[in-house]
Each structure stands twice: as structure tokens, then as C-alpha cells.
Amino acid sequence: MSDNKHRVTRRQFLNYTLTGVGGFMAAGMLMPMLRFAFDPILRETAGTDMVAVADVKEITTEPKRFDFKVKVKDAWYESEEPRSAWVYKDEKGDIIALSPVCKHLGCTVDWNTDKNNPNHFFCPCHYGLYTKDGTNVPGTPPTAPLDRYEFEVKDGKLYLGKAKPRGEA
């Protein structure tokens, strides 16, 4: 055996120790940051975007406004956003769910509030008019019909999804 053993000097020991401790500290700081950055990508989303709004029994041929809340996720921030819909049954008994957002400048339309134009959706901001099925009346400010909500009926309840544009009139 040789007397030439490999000895660690004090300087090397401190260097190894500080490097190890620094590495653990850096990992401790980086792990939460990485989890924060990648969590939305790795998290599973909800199975459906449909929200229960009303009992089908409540829906008549007269448009009725239903207010509801939708869970919205903006990156890491989750909130409940209030929404509303004008819902009625047409002559065939089919359910129609219209967005109340005017296609002119985004004001809220109301049903049957303009005395000069009964049985129309009316936007009081700029006097926009829509027929009962949500079609914009020519000669008024709106440039497109009201959006329609996706919907499904399940167990006697009406579920609404996203509002879909219907295009130019």
C-alpha cells in the first residue's frame, strides 16, 4: 500500500459542499416555477362546456331571458362569468337560444321593449332591431343576426354551450 492517499483539501471540500447546497437551492426555487408554467398544459380539462340553464317546462313560445354563469379559465385564473340567453320555442316546437349581445357594438338587446316595433328584439343603444328568430332588420345598425347558443336537452333540463355566429345577413 502506498502512503499516497488521495486526500480532499479543505478548499475542495467547501467547493463541493457549496456546489451541492447551491444546486439543491436552485432546484427548490425552479420546481415551483416550472410547475406553475406547465400546470395548465398538463391539467385535464372539463369534459363538457354545457351549463344547465332552465327546465324545458319553463320554455314557451314567448322569448324569456335566462341568466347563468359559465366557468372561464384564462391561463391560470379561473372565474365565473355571467351570461344570459333569450330562449323560446318556435312554431315547430324546436328550442331556439339566442345571445343577447347586439352585433352592432355589443350592447344588450331586449325582447318587445320598443313600442314602435312590437315582437322584435330591440337594442336601445343605437335603435337596432332583430326579428324573433334573431335576424337583423335591414336598415338598422346591426350587420349580422344574433348568435345562437349550442344546446342540448337532457333529463328535462336545457343545457347551453357556446354562442355561435350565424354569418352576415
Swiss-Prot record:
SUPFAM superfamilies: ISP domain. The main subunits of the menaquinol:cytochrome c complex are a Rieske-type iron-sulfur protein (QcrA), a cytochrome b (QcrB) and a cytochrome c (QcrC). This is Menaquinol:cytochrome c reductase iron-sulfur subunit. Disulfide bonds join 107-125. Its cofactor is [2Fe-2S] cluster. InterPro entries: Rieske_2Fe-2S (IPR017941), Rieske_2Fe-2S_sf (IPR036922), Rieske_Fe-S_prot (IPR014349), TAT_signal (IPR006311). Belongs to the Rieske iron-sulfur protein family. PANTHER family: CYTOCHROME B-C1 COMPLEX SUBUNIT RIESKE, MITOCHONDRIAL. Binds 1 [2Fe-2S] cluster per subunit. The lineage of its organism: Bacteria, Bacillati, Bacillota, Bacilli, Bacillales. Residues 62-160 form the Rieske domain. The keyword Protease does not apply. It comes from the Bacteria. Keywords: 2Fe-2S, Disulfide bond, Electron transport, Iron, Iron-sulfur, Metal-binding, Oxidoreductase, Transport. GO terms for molecular function: 2 iron, 2 sulfur cluster binding; metal ion binding; monooxygenase activity; oxidoreductase activity, acting on paired donors, with incorporation or reduction of molecular oxygen. [2Fe-2S] cluster binds at residues 102, 104, 123, 126. Component of the menaquinol:cytochrome c reductase complex. The Rieske protein is a high potential 2Fe-2S protein.
